[in-house]
């Protein structure tokens, strides 16, 4: 069993998620604060004494952070390969801190605020790749899913805390600029904690193995697992890492085009698709524009409604730690996609057909129904698509390709994040709550994609996952492999053989087996991959 201290250290890396969540959770409320609007909005109505934004300006203020995050994702890969994940986490945290300082000290120029958000996004985007990758590579297999899930848990905690801060500051009148400067200033604290905390954490053991620092690699593995170096489990894990490193690096450094080669293209596109659909579920429709959306339902306190939604998001994410470890990855993603599609369909139908009365006033009962189904959507999203997307990307790639594949997958996430955050004002102003039908369709498509393409990886080591994807086992049959694997674990003789040979046995007897077309020697690291569903 992993030491408690190791678990705490790995969970601490999820502070990167908190930084991301704090930015996401604060911007929606900040753009609706009067002092901020008086400085950066481009419309003023003297009759009502209110400020408002054009769709373009609001989209840029909210969404441009995601252009920075997309670039940060792509930059994270070469720097992570060269300097290691620990040093890069610290470096990108400094980039984040710098961006927050510029936001905090900006003059009344919306362009300067936008540029500061882009700079902040560079740090957030890079950390969204490196931090879950560090956790995946450093965690013992039996708790890896739970550890990486804490990254999403901390995102939701950051969103919730930011909403609480917004709720407490949006009515400041003595020093009105404190309405939005306090939420932004507090975000500095999370970056500072992250930077100094990383001083006490070790480097990823798999990165050390790649660099030939084998003694340090074994030392960290044994410390993380709480077992001596001569323990059979440690020897098997260490030998598996060494074999994987030697095989994956035999072809030399990985170039960007190679992540779309036959050997890895299937997983590259899967990761990009999963991360894209995590955004296309529509979660950030609520997190970025929740305050504005709920104001449209006629509520007197849209800040409170957004806070309730964020609280549901945070509370339900605790369930994800259990869901992903007990039910795996495929099942929750499929069920979650269908559930979320239903929620958005009802949300859009009520908003489009029942929210506004013939006399133009809001139907508060319809508004309450919309909030309920918004919460039911978040109930599902927080336990399925929110954490599982990061888990899949963090554990699906072999060492040689891992940093670049994770970078392009996460860049896909941030690209669609930008598309939604920027175009939502335009679309909402055009079709109103019918926008929800788009997300309902996307959620249903996401469930189908997972059923057809994603393999079940619960409880496998990173090396076993690599071999599973190299096999011809159909994605919808990998659940059967998991059940067989649990049965095999009951046999003492099979325990002595080690987890890798268990996978080999299943592959040898699987339909359309990979083993039938490859020799035993080449089975571990084949040069050509037959994609199970034709990608």
From Swiss-Prot:
Q: Which UniProt keywords apply?
A: Glycoprotein, Meiosis, Membrane, Sugar transport, Transmembrane, Transmembrane helix, Transport
**Chief place where the protein resides:** membrane
Q: How does the protein associate with the membrane?
A: Multi-pass membrane protein
**Where in the sequence does glycosylation occur per the annotation?**
359
Q: Where in the cell is it found?
A: Membrane
- Gene Ontology molecular function: carbohydrate:proton symporter activity
The segments labelled Disordered in the record are 484-535
Which stretches does UniProt call biased (Basic and acidic residues)?
484-508
- The UniProt transmembrane annotation reads 10-30, 59-79, 88-108, 113-133, 145-165, 182-202, 269-287, 304-324, 331-351, 366-386, 407-427, 435-455
> GO biological process: any one?
carbohydrate transmembrane transport
Please list the residue ranges that the record places on the Extracellular side of the membrane.
31-58, 109-112, 166-181, 288-303, 352-365, 428-434
Residue spans, topological domain Cytoplasmic: 1-9, 80-87, 134-144, 203-268, 325-330, 387-406, 456-535
| Gene Ontology CC terms | cell division site; cell tip; fungal-type vacuole; plasma membrane
- Report the sequence similarity comment from the record: Belongs to the major facilitator superfamily. Sugar transporter (TC 2.A.1.1) family.
| Function of the protein | High-affinity fructose transporter.
Give the protein name, as stated in the record.
High-affinity fructose transporter ght6
**Organism listed in the record:** Schizosaccharomyces pombe (strain 972 / ATCC 24843)
């Amino acid at each position: 069993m992993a030491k408690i201290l190791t678990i705490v250290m790995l969970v601490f890396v999820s502070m990167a998620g908190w930084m991301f969540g704090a930015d996401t959770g604060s911007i929606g409320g900040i753009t609706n604060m009067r002092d901020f609007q008086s400085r950066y909005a481009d419309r003023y109505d003297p009759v009502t004494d209110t400020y408002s934004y054009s769709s373009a300006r609001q989209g840029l203020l909210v969404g441009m952070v995601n252009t920075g995050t997309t670039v940060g994702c792509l930059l994270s890969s070469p720097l992570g390969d060269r300097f290691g994940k620990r040093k890069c986490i610290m470096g990108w945290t400094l980039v984040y801190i710098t961006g927050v300082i510029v936001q905090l000290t900006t003059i009344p120029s919306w362009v300067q605020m936008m540029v500061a958000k882009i700079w902040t996004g560079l740090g957030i985007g890079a950390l969204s790749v490196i931090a879950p990758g560090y956790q995946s590579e450093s965690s013992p297999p039996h708790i890896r899913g739970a550890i990486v899930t804490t990254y999403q848990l901390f995102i939701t905690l950051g969103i919730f805390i930011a909403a609480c801060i917004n709720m407490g500051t949006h009515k400041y009148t003595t020093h009105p600029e404190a309405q939005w400067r306090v939420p932004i200033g507090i975000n500095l604290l999370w970056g500072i904690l992250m930077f100094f905390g990383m001083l006490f954490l070790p480097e990823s053991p798999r990165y050390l193995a790649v660099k030939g620092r084998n003694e340090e690699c074994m030392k960290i593995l044994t410390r993380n697992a709480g077992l001596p170096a001569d323990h059979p489990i440690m020897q098997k894990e260490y030998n598996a890492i060494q074999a994987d490193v030697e095989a994956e690096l035999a072809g030399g450094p990985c170039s960007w085009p190679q992540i779309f080669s036959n050997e890895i293209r299937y997983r590259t596109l899967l990761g990009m698709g999963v991360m894209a659909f995590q955004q296309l579920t529509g979660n950030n429709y609520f997190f970025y524009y929740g305050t504005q959306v709920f104001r449209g339902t006629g509520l007197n306190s849209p800040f409170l409604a957004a806070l309730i939604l964020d609280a549901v998001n945070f509370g339900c994410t605790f369930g994800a730690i259990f869901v992903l470890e007990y039910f795996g990855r495929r099942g929750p993603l499929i069920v979650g996609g269908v559930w979320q599609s239903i929620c958005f369909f009802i949300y859009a139908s009520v908003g489009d057909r029942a929210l506004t009365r013939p006399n133009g006033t809001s139907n508060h009962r319809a508004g309450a129904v919309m909030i309920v189904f918004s919460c039911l959507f978040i109930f599902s999203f927080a336990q399925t698509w929110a954490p599982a997307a990061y888990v899949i990307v963090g554990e699906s790639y072999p060492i040689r390709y891992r940093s670049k594949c994770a970078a392009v997958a996460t860049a896909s996430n941030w690209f669609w994040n930008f598309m939604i955050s920027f175009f939502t004002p335009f679309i909402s102003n055009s079709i109103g709550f019918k926008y929800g039908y788009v997300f309902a369709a996307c959620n249903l498509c996401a469930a189908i994609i997972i059923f057809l393409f994603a393999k079940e990886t619960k409880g496998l080591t990173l090396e076993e996952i690599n071999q599973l994807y190299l096999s011809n086992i159909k994605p919808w049959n990998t659940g059967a492999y998991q059940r067989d694997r649990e049965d095999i674990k009951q046999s003492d003789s099979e325990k002595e053989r080690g987890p890798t040979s268990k996978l080999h046995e299943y592959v040898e007897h699987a339909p359309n087996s990979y083993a039938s077309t490859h020799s035993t020697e080449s089975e571990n690291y084949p040069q050509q991959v037959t994609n199970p569903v034709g990608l």
